Protein backbone atom coordinates (compact mmCIF):
# COMPACT_ATOMS: atom_id res chain seq x y z
CA UNK A 1 0.00 0.00 0.00
CA UNK A 2 3.02 2.27 0.34
CA UNK A 3 3.17 2.56 -3.44
CA UNK A 4 -0.39 3.86 -3.56
CA UNK A 5 0.34 6.41 -0.82
CA UNK A 6 3.34 7.72 -2.79
CA UNK A 7 1.33 7.80 -6.01
CA UNK A 8 -1.49 9.64 -4.23
CA UNK A 9 0.94 12.33 -3.08
CA UNK A 10 2.34 12.62 -6.61
CA UNK A 11 -1.14 12.91 -8.16
CA UNK A 12 -2.19 15.54 -5.61
CA UNK A 13 0.84 17.65 -6.57
CA UNK A 14 0.40 17.53 -10.35
CA UNK A 15 -1.54 19.95 -12.52
CA UNK A 16 -4.98 18.36 -13.01
CA UNK A 17 -5.51 20.26 -16.25
CA UNK A 18 -2.73 18.26 -17.90
CA UNK A 19 -4.07 15.16 -19.70
CA UNK A 20 -3.21 11.88 -18.00
CA UNK A 21 -4.61 8.38 -18.35
CA UNK A 22 -3.78 6.30 -15.29
CA UNK A 23 -4.29 2.72 -16.39
CA UNK A 24 -3.43 -0.81 -15.39
CA UNK A 25 -3.89 -3.67 -12.99
CA UNK A 26 -4.42 -1.88 -9.68
CA UNK A 27 -5.26 -5.18 -7.93
CA UNK A 28 -8.06 -3.46 -6.01
CA UNK A 29 -11.78 -3.73 -6.74
CA UNK A 30 -13.17 -0.47 -5.32
CA UNK A 31 -16.94 -0.99 -5.40
CA UNK A 32 -19.38 -3.62 -4.22
CA UNK A 33 -20.35 -3.87 -7.90
CA UNK A 34 -16.74 -4.70 -8.85
CA UNK A 35 -16.72 -8.03 -7.00
CA UNK A 36 -18.81 -11.17 -7.28
CA UNK A 37 -19.75 -11.12 -3.57
CA UNK A 38 -19.19 -7.92 -1.58
CA UNK A 39 -19.70 -9.43 1.87
CA UNK A 40 -17.27 -12.28 1.24
CA UNK A 41 -14.69 -10.23 -0.68
CA UNK A 42 -14.54 -7.43 1.92
CA UNK A 43 -12.41 -9.83 3.97
CA UNK A 44 -10.17 -10.86 1.06
CA UNK A 45 -7.12 -9.06 -0.32
CA UNK A 46 -8.17 -6.82 -3.23
CA UNK A 47 -11.42 -5.52 -1.70
CA UNK A 48 -10.75 -4.89 2.00
CA UNK A 49 -12.01 -1.58 3.43
CA UNK A 50 -8.43 -0.32 3.81
CA UNK A 51 -7.56 -1.07 0.19
CA UNK A 52 -10.78 0.47 -1.10
CA UNK A 53 -10.17 3.61 0.98
CA UNK A 54 -6.60 3.87 -0.31
CA UNK A 55 -7.73 3.59 -3.93
CA UNK A 56 -10.53 6.12 -3.40
CA UNK A 57 -7.99 8.60 -1.96
CA UNK A 58 -5.80 8.14 -5.03
CA UNK A 59 -8.73 8.76 -7.36
CA UNK A 60 -9.76 11.88 -5.43
CA UNK A 61 -6.19 13.22 -5.26
CA UNK A 62 -5.98 13.35 -9.04
CA UNK A 63 -9.62 14.22 -9.64
CA UNK A 64 -9.76 11.17 -11.89
CA UNK A 65 -12.90 9.94 -13.60
CA UNK A 66 -13.31 6.18 -13.85
CA UNK A 67 -13.98 5.92 -17.59
CA UNK A 68 -15.08 2.28 -17.40
CA UNK A 69 -17.61 2.99 -14.64
CA UNK A 70 -18.77 6.06 -16.55
CA UNK A 71 -19.58 3.76 -19.50
CA UNK A 72 -21.20 1.10 -17.28
CA UNK A 73 -22.73 2.83 -14.24
CA UNK A 74 -23.51 1.05 -11.00
CA UNK A 75 -25.34 -1.12 -10.15
CA UNK A 76 -24.05 -3.03 -13.19
CA UNK A 77 -21.52 -5.61 -12.06
CA UNK A 78 -18.18 -5.51 -13.87
CA UNK A 79 -15.14 -7.76 -13.87
CA UNK A 80 -11.80 -7.74 -15.66
CA UNK A 81 -10.20 -10.68 -13.84
CA UNK A 82 -11.25 -14.28 -13.23
CA UNK A 83 -9.26 -16.97 -11.46
CA UNK A 84 -7.70 -19.79 -13.42
CA UNK A 85 -9.20 -22.18 -10.86
CA UNK A 86 -12.63 -22.00 -12.47
CA UNK A 87 -12.94 -24.26 -15.50
CA UNK A 88 -15.67 -22.04 -16.93
CA UNK A 89 -15.18 -18.44 -15.84
CA UNK A 90 -18.59 -17.38 -17.14
CA UNK A 91 -20.43 -20.17 -15.36
CA UNK A 92 -18.74 -19.57 -12.00
CA UNK A 93 -18.95 -15.79 -12.55
CA UNK A 94 -16.59 -14.99 -9.68
CA UNK A 95 -14.82 -12.09 -11.31
CA UNK A 96 -13.30 -8.90 -9.94
CA UNK A 97 -12.70 -5.53 -11.59
CA UNK A 98 -9.02 -5.08 -10.78
CA UNK A 99 -8.00 -3.30 -13.98
CA UNK A 100 -8.82 0.36 -14.40
CA UNK A 101 -8.69 3.32 -16.79
CA UNK A 102 -8.82 6.69 -15.05
CA UNK A 103 -8.79 10.03 -16.86
CA UNK A 104 -7.55 13.27 -15.34
CA UNK A 105 -9.80 16.34 -15.58
CA UNK A 106 -7.58 17.51 -18.45
CA UNK A 107 -8.22 14.30 -20.40
CA UNK A 108 -11.84 13.54 -19.48
CA UNK A 109 -13.32 15.81 -22.18
CA UNK A 110 -11.40 13.81 -24.81
CA UNK A 111 -12.85 10.46 -23.71
CA UNK A 112 -15.45 9.27 -26.22
CA UNK A 113 -18.53 8.66 -24.04
CA UNK A 114 -19.47 5.02 -23.66
CA UNK A 115 -16.40 3.78 -25.54
CA UNK A 116 -14.76 1.90 -22.68
CA UNK A 117 -14.76 -1.84 -23.27
CA UNK A 118 -13.68 -4.80 -21.15
CA UNK A 119 -12.64 -7.43 -23.69
CA UNK A 120 -13.73 -10.46 -21.67
CA UNK A 121 -13.88 -12.76 -24.70
CA UNK A 122 -10.08 -12.90 -24.46
CA UNK A 123 -10.57 -15.19 -21.46
CA UNK A 124 -12.01 -17.78 -23.87
CA UNK A 125 -8.72 -18.04 -25.78
CA UNK A 126 -6.28 -20.91 -25.29
CA UNK A 127 -4.03 -20.16 -22.29
CA UNK A 128 -5.21 -16.56 -21.79
CA UNK A 129 -4.21 -14.16 -19.07
CA UNK A 130 -6.44 -14.10 -16.02
CA UNK A 131 -6.93 -10.36 -16.76
CA UNK A 132 -8.84 -8.91 -19.72
CA UNK A 133 -7.67 -5.98 -21.81
CA UNK A 134 -9.62 -2.76 -21.37
CA UNK A 135 -9.79 -0.06 -24.02
CA UNK A 136 -11.24 3.41 -24.38
CA UNK A 137 -11.44 5.73 -27.37
CA UNK A 138 -9.98 9.22 -27.07
CA UNK A 139 -10.79 12.11 -29.39
CA UNK A 140 -7.36 13.74 -29.60
Each predicted region: which residue ranges?
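Short, well-ordered beta-to-alpha junction loops that form the rim of enzyme active sites
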Residues: 23-31
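Active-site metal-binding loops of divalent metal-dependent hydrolases
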Residues: 19, 26, 132
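Metal-dependent phosphoester-hydrolase catalytic domains
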Residues: 32-140
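Amphipathic alpha-helical interface surfaces
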Residues: 3, 7, 22, 51-54
